[in-house]
Amino acid sequence: MSNEYVALITARGGSKGLLRKNVLPLHGIPLIGWTIKAAQGCSYISKVFVSTDDYEIAKISEGLGALVINRPEELATDTASSIDVILHAISWLEQKEVQKYEGMILLQPTSPLRTSHHIKEAIELYEKTAAKFVISVFEPTHTPIKSYLENDDGTISGLYSNEAPYQRRQDLPRAYQPNGAIYAFSIDEFKLNNHFPRNKVFPYVMSEVESADIDTLEDLRKVEEQLKIKEINK
């Protein structure tokens, strides 16, 4: 497999939930560092880029060996779309980089338990299936297949079917929830449609524990404890 993949980590300075979360220490490393190191540890990835508007995030990222894409202010607001951020990064790469990359691996910095091995397996799935899009997911404890939707008249109907809420879980299709950890896609395909591919989408399944997403101080504390236990059990 050739190194035609580039990793993109999107990390703006502002955050509504946990302030400055991308640079908060987690087990001795800034939160974003876990994602940078995971990307660097995957042999299929040629270079690791961080798109940010924030000076501190940029300096930490460069110190860890990542390359920085300076994101304009208008793409760092609460209303800025991830699509526009990715398109900006692709345009930047095409202008600044000599090497042409076929695939992009988008990694959110708030998924510290996603490892190099996960990224490697997701890329291998992308290649093996000739997928247009691979997205990391987990199977939630309570399947949404058994959920209801509210109708305009106040009644409720089964989300999947009217029978699904009353069926055994094992008789229903598996349902997945995206965890935001890994998105693998073709750069040319993304540019063509200005969005993630909608067909030939394959799931890369991770455990619910590995899918931890840092949004609150409690999330950070839980992952800190998990990392301590993991280190003890080495």
Short names for language-model regions:
Residues M1-L19:
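N-terminal nucleotide-binding beta1-loop-alpha1 segment
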